[in-house]
């Protein structure tokens, strides 16, 4: 009987320690992520950001994906501004409709990282993506060399309002 009492006391002590050590998660750094679409590589990027945030106490990552809807993306970015995020990460769907709201976030002092597609302004903290102008130039030279400077080519472009399509065309 005495053994069961000691075992019960031990279990209560352990459970009490677990309960008291489980404090409420305090968010000290809120990251807002606005994704333009939910294709596989963006889905993987989201998972990696969420996984990385697990290594840091107090970091919360909130991801919103708009499935190629400019108006919804602008609304989501405004949501992040009003929520007072500490960092905003934006993968713009199209540059023109998203630029003003990204500028608003930047003007309010929120660091903004633009990913994959640029905006039509320099009002962002950092850009992570390809040099699409150079990519377009290299592809053009490659095709011209293959055709020995003769014939006509056809350009297949991406989303008309996206900066990769614009830059690669130039």
Which residues are covered by each model-predicted region?
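Bacterial N-terminal signal peptides
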Residues: 8-17
